[in-house]
């Protein structure tokens, strides 16, 4: 089969050209189908450094992110390669900072640039998307913690909506039922008394170990 025999030639194509191909393949409304086809020929490694076969979660979040992107396109909603890359690279990022089924926050921050540099070798991601991707990643920490009045600041962040959408993708890919996504869905409602009660409940639990842990259970296995 020519695809199997010649697939290695993709590594000789410029990373700028491959970024263009990344956008055409994954941002045209058939991203999930195209990704599955690439995986069947073992060609996905030429476009994304994350390996969908590394874990069930890796596979789930990559598929869920692509499905989410396809759905947005069908609904005439905006899409950006920055959001998709934030999701596709997430398994690679967290795999570098997990210890004893917990994410080491210091390693989390130290690993971000390294992951992006590795992806850059495959696809020349425009610099403007690097800060976008890192904002989405860092906001995941804050979306989990919800310390005191922090949620009020988070919803004013220019990347909040993208970070919230990514949280829902992670939650779905993890099959998590603890309601973090719903908490943020409810918090966005313009109701001060509801927001106050939501925060009060979190602050009551702030001294428990579970409230200080970051990440969904299946994400950390």
Language-model features: locations:
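Glycine- and charge-enriched loop/helix tracts that form the active or gating conduit
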Residues: 1-99
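Charged substrate- and nucleic-acid-binding regions of tRNA-handling and nucleotidyl-transfer enzymes
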Residues: 46, 121-221
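Short, mixed-charge aromatic SLiMs
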Residues: 5-19, 107-125, 186-197
């Amino acid at each position: 089969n020519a695809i199997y025999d010649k697939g290695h030639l993709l590594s000789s194509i410029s990373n700028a050209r491959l970024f263009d191909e990344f956008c055409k393949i994954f941002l045209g409304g058939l991203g999930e189908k195209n990704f599955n086809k690439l995986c069947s020929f073992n060609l996905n490694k030429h476009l994304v450094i994350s390996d969908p076969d590394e874990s069930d979660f890796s596979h789930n979040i990559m598929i869920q992110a692509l499905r989410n992107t396809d759905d947005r396109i069908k609904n005439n909603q905006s899409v950006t390669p920055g959001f998709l890359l934030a999701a596709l690279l997430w398994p690679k990022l967290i795999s570098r900072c997990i210890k004893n089924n917990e994410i080491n926050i210091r390693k989390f921050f130290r690993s971000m640039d390294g992951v992006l540099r590795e992806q850059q070798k495959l696809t020349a991601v425009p610099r403007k998307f690097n800060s976008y991707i890192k904002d989405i990643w860092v906001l995941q920490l804050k979306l989990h913690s919800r310390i005191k009045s922090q949620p009020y600041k988070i919803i004013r962040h220019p990347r909040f909506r993208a970070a919230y959408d990514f949280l829902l993708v992670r939650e779905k890919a993890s099959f998590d039922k603890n309601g973090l996504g719903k908490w943020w869905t409810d918090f966005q409602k313009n109701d001060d008394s509801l927001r106050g009660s939501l925060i009060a409940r979190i602050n009551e639990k702030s001294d428990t170990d579970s409230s200080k842990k970051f990440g969904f259970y299946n994400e950390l296995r």
